[in-house]
Amino acid sequence: MSKIIAINAGSSSLKFQLFEMPSETVLTKGLVERIGLEDSIFTITVDGEKQKEITNIPDHAVAVNMLLKKLTENGIVKSLDEIGGIGHRVVHGGEKFADSVLITDEVLADIEELSDLAPLHNPANVVGIKAFQEVLPNVPAVAVFDTAFHQTMPESAFLYSLPYEYYEKFGIRKYGFHGTSHKYVTERAAELLGRPLESLSLLSCHLGNGASIAAVEGGKSIDTSMGFTPLAGVTMGTRSGNIDPALIPYIMEKTGQTVEEVVSVLNKKSGMLGLTGYSSDLRDIIAKEEEGDHRAKVALDVFVSRIHKYIGSYTARMKGVDAIIFTAGVGENSAIIRERVLEGLEYMGVYFDAKRNNVFGEEAFINFPHSPVKIIVIPTDEEVMIARDVLRLGNIG
């Protein structure tokens, strides 16, 4: 048995989960927030109880030291020697990484170089990797990329209709995101269906504050809704999803905003927040719709209609689907959104059962038994995928 830590480092946060592998038992998990501020928050679960501490954590290295100290102090590990591997979520692997990889100096340099493609995320991921290297330099560390799963997309899916030299010179193409989540739920769907993954055509709907749809054929991603960045695709909590690109200079002209300001609006003030004017949270918006709020209704209609566009086109691409999967915060917990997405899809063999659909955050088939297309709710588990890859690549036993 080996203990493996899965790490997700943000610019001012560090999310962690410690597994006993290969049993996949979660020993503890937690979150360090507001790193760099005087009132940083450190939360860890010990024996099922959440412990919370507000203290000054100036940087990620201090956060890592504090985390490791808490593991030994609470007897979760007897000594740090028990930690056999570390897995780091890295948002962007570009075309360089089609799989998770053992971190070397060269790999770390490549990840830093790819920061151009993910300026908000990759630098933070690198900081997390370096912080652990300082404290546990001899423990195998693995980078698990959000983009890697989508590297199987054909050129017809990943190329934009732009001058080809933009792709050759600047790497401008669709990359796709949420890959670790889409990989986990499609592999789990094959297990639940009792069929080989290689024989299945699956639609994976990762619906959270960020949302993406993936077409997965034979276990390989053949298309996905996010693009060069996670701004593309369906309408999201605060992100616009696809818009006419000519709108950007038009908005600049009308508002006097810079490119950076307009892109910030598209990322942080658009989507459901932009449409409603008051919230990016679907629970708030559904409650407002029930009170008769017109903009809430319109926002929900837009959200669902954009998802339908991808379901329709990806079903055509795969010449039919075996199952539709719902995952992530909204996909796992909102029966109302699932119902609206599934309504009217009988033409493609989708028959959902409203009673079975009444599930929240647990695995369930929500289709009628006679439905040719199965509908499955699967809570995602990106952390366990990270731990599995550390076990696979880290030569840990």
Swiss-Prot record:
GO terms for molecular function: acetate kinase activity; ATP binding; magnesium ion binding. Its EC number is 2.7.2.1. Gene3D superfamilies: 3.30.420.40. GO terms for cellular component: cytoplasm. The active site is at D146. It is found in: Cytoplasm. Keywords: ATP-binding, Cytoplasm, Kinase, Magnesium, Metal-binding, Nucleotide-binding, Transferase. The record marks H178, R239 as: Transition state stabilizer. ATP binds at K15, H206, L207, G208, N209, G210, D281, L282, R283, G329, V330, G331, E332, N333. Its cofactor is Mg(2+); Mn(2+). It catalyses: acetate + ATP = acetyl phosphate + ADP. Pathway: Metabolic intermediate biosynthesis; acetyl-CoA biosynthesis; acetyl-CoA from acetate: step 1/2. One of its GO terms (biological process) is acetyl-CoA biosynthetic process. Its main location: cytoplasm. Mg(2+) binds at N8, E382. InterPro entries: Ac/propionate_kinase, Aliphatic_acid_kin_short-chain, Aliphatic_acid_kinase_CS, ATPase_NBD. Substrate binds at R89. Mg(2+). Can also accept Mn(2+). Transmembrane segments: none annotated. It comes from the Bacteria. Belongs to the acetokinase family. HAMAP family: Acetate_kinase. Homodimer. PANTHER family: ACETATE KINASE, ACETATE KINASE-RELATED. Catalyzes the formation of acetyl phosphate from acetate and ATP. Can also catalyze the reverse reaction. This is Acetate kinase. It comes from Bacillus anthracis. The gene is ackA.
